[in-house]
Amino acid sequence: MPSQEDAVAWSTGCCGLVIVWFVLGRLAGSVAGMFNDR
């Protein structure tokens, strides 16, 4: 079993990656929408 610190760091890293990808997707959608409106 991993230590408490390892488990916290691992779960935080995974959640952080999901949040980063979600934000990037939202930004890409906003930029695409701006270009489509022209």
Swiss-Prot record:
Transmembrane segments: 7-29
Protein's cellular compartments: Virion; Host membrane
The keyword Membrane is annotated on this UniProt entry: yes
Record membrane topology: Single-pass membrane protein
Main location: virion
InterPro entries: Tail_VII
Record-level GO cellular component terms: host cell membrane; membrane; virion component
UniProt entry keywords in alphabetical sequence: Host membrane, Membrane, Transmembrane, Transmembrane helix, Virion
Family: Belongs to the inovirus G7P protein family.
Protein role: May initiate with G9P the virion concomitant assembly-budding process, by interacting with the packaging signal of the viral genome. The assembly-budding takes place at the host inner membrane. In turn, G7P and G9P are present at the end of the filamentous virion that emerges first from the bacterial host.
Name listed for the protein in its UniProt record: Tail virion protein G7P
Organism per entry: Xanthomonas phage phiLf (Bacteriophage phi-Lf)
Gene of this entry: VII
